[in-house]
Amino acid sequence: MVLPIYTYGQPVLRKVAKDIPLDYPDLKELIQDMFETNTASDGVGLAAPQIGKSIRVVIVDLDVLSDTFPEYKDYRHAFINGHILEYDDSETETMEEGCLSLPGLHENVTRAKRIYVKWLDENLVEHEEWVDGYLARVIQHEFDHLEGRVFTDRLTPFRKQMITSKLKALLQGKIRCHYRVEAPRK
């Protein structure tokens, strides 16, 4: 089922998400709904807070990029109770990012090129590994949502000032996008 995306200004986007118990009800259905919502919204990743749930569940679907990046063919994974344990800040990269919760807004964000991540997959198998490249960027972006952050929090004060009017418009529910949203109440 395709769910609405909660947009900037929704309180759930500012909460630190909680780990879920291993017997979380309907977890597989939730993950499937998140993949369907992400696909319908043309995203590459989605965190549970973006659908109104303050829990540590993220999905990443890089298969949509496989024409350009063959290494991401069939890359569709869930990250349950995920945590970034280490950032290798020896190399960073600045790249334009957008977010389904901030439709129409794109800004350059600097992130570590390599991170060490721990998570459970959709079968509740534990993983711990170094991740790099674009996948590391997507995981950092989505895991920020689990910490109550959005990508605009990583901008310089000058850039934040430059986009103030766009953020205010989002807060007022002035949103143009092709997917269903749950905007903040005016």
Which ranges hold each PLM region?
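Active-site rim/adjacent substrate-binding subdomains
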Residues: 1-140, 145-186
